[in-house]
Amino acid sequence: HRYGRRQRQMCIRDSVYLDPDFDIPSEWKVSFGGTWNAPNGYVINADLIITRGQDTAIYKRGDLAKTGEVTDEGYPVYESVKEPSFVLTNSLNSNESEAFSTSVFKSFDSGLDMRLGYAYTDARDVNPMTSSVAFSNYVNRSFFDPQEDVVSNSNYSMKHRFVGVFNYTTSFIDGYDTRFTLYAQSNSGYPYSITLSGYGGTVGAYGYTPYLDFNENVLVQAGTRNDQEGSWWTKADLRVSQELPGLVEGHKARAFIVIDNVTNFLNDDWGVLEKPNFPFGVTEDDVAAGIAEARIGGASLWEIRMGVNYKF
């Protein structure tokens, strides 16, 4: 791939300029919220946030022009007609999202209190803008046409999320509280796209024009960025704390133990987070082989912390 490497070296020296008509992006947000103190001590909250972008920023190649031809698979053919460059400009479309959340809280006389929550998010954007430089922002996304300006599911859109917090306080030692806290969460998977291989996109579909860094970023079908959903992730954390007498009057002590991802502590197959590798393009062969997602080590491990708090 000598020619491809030479093209990559050229990309490093590409100029980046600002569209003379560039407008500063902005967002409009509208939020609604309410709290209902329901009978029997239940407290119910609900919130809705609607966001609409304006003058959304997008990077494009400033040197490309369509030849008017397309490949057999329908990919447009480009040629570079100027010095290689990127331009930061405004999208013809805008980012948008809707987020709804609700929760219910109840405290019982037995020493138990609980909070259950649910959140739904539907977020769409033109470009996830994941990076600090123009070239990376250009290639670290999925597209059918690298110059396209379309709104699709966002990398950051997690459709469903459930949360539960349970606290139970009792006294195994007279006058000193023992407190158990269980935090549990379950959320739907991360979005990803079905793409060509890195070689298939950079060379097969676009013949190095533009250079696409051999990322798995060229969609098999148009309009399908992030239309796939990864595996759900469910985990729980446990904290147990015990009040203790201080060394002198007025001092307080508390011993605690925290098990992060107690689900994985109980079973190696539980509490495991799997998601596609960045930038979230997956080939059909990877899907067929069952390797579309990778295990995320840090989030999937269990951890135990113990300590003592002493106040004086």
Identify the function of each model-found stretch:
Residues 1-12:
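Single conserved hydrophobic/aromatic residue that forms the stacking wall/gate
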